[in-house]
């Protein structure tokens, strides 16, 4: 019972459905044609029997006026029964007398045998009628034989259609089987899995949809891996970079809690704790921005007006650093597709580095647009960066020899990250103002 329930509960395969649909589709016209042929055969056999009776009657009628002593049989139909009635006299060519029936053709039973009877009225002084009959046995046997042939032909036609459908369905479902095999062979760790199917357009559409789905899954998997790597990196770097300042803070706090220091020394220790706390806060904030940058996607990119972005950055820098002279070189509007917050972060960090580590008092912002893209430059009159250190300072927690030790060492790393996220580069050069020039080269839309 369980096996049967499983069989009937199981969803039929596509191949089976194609075969069933083809068999039903073939059965309908075959049954219609078979029914027409069946009825046609039945009527034709009956018409043949009627023609036999007509022929036998036509042969017998000329002999009736000669007398009823002998009624000859038709030479073409020796089995035909002939019964002649003239008045009250009834004469038959056999021991079976056909009953009197209405004119034309009629069916009757004599001694339990079914007969087809043709009755013809002959005009004359005395009413005379000739009844010619024949059994249905031969006609029924012949009709049944032809009916069996029709059934066999119809059954063969439907069966042949089902067999051909089964064979052709094998080719039709082959792309789907290939798709299933390729899907089963895909492991969770596969990179950019490929699903290639050729054949039916429906299978190709499903394969394309699966490729898109797998690509999205793969992209999300990569993002998850990147997020996990970023989290591990964040934890490792945070542990390494924060251990020293936290140890210094703990030492200072222990000194404050255990020693009775003079006011000036106590104030100096407290200031050191505050500076260390600010450094830790800056480091954590920079690490957070780095992690956010690594998790950004192309969906976050929007049109950005670089000229307007630099103008706002210059105004904000003038407010944050009152002693700094910040200017923007006039230029036409430059619009690219990018991350507004990320580009603003890169420009702000470049200005902050120029002030904090280069001691700059003059910063000049500019943007130049070309077919290749946009080039953003931040020039300052600070101490600059030695040529041998211009690549190293873009690494995380890397500080130049001229940099102060109060920063997190992540400012230029954030700039390099944003350049990479936009498909561009970040580099340091000599500035016409005497200090350093930080250049962001961002490609235009492809």
From Swiss-Prot:
Record membrane topology: Multi-pass membrane protein
- Name the residues that span the membrane: 19-39, 151-171
Top enzyme category:
transferase
Task: Give residues where Phosphohistidine occurs.
Answer: 240
Give the induction annotation.
By nitrogen-limiting conditions.
- UniProt PTM: Autophosphorylated.
Look up keyword Cell membrane and say if it applies.
Answer: yes
Question: A GO molecular function for this record?
Answer: ATP binding
Give the CC-aspect GO terms.
peptidoglycan-based cell wall; plasma membrane
Write down the InterPro entries for this protein, in alphabetical order: HAMP_dom, HATPase_C_sf, His_kinase_dom, HisK_dim/P_dom, HisK_dim/P_sf, Sig_transdc_His_kin-like_C, TCS_sensor_his_kinase
Keyword annotations for this protein, in alphabetical order, are: ATP-binding, Cell membrane, Kinase, Membrane, Nucleotide-binding, Phosphoprotein, Transferase, Transmembrane, Transmembrane helix, Two-component regulatory system
Q: Which residues form the HAMP domain?
A: 172-222
For this entry, the protein name equals Sensor-type histidine kinase PrrB
* Organism this protein belongs to: Mycobacterium tuberculosis (strain ATCC 25618 / H37Rv)
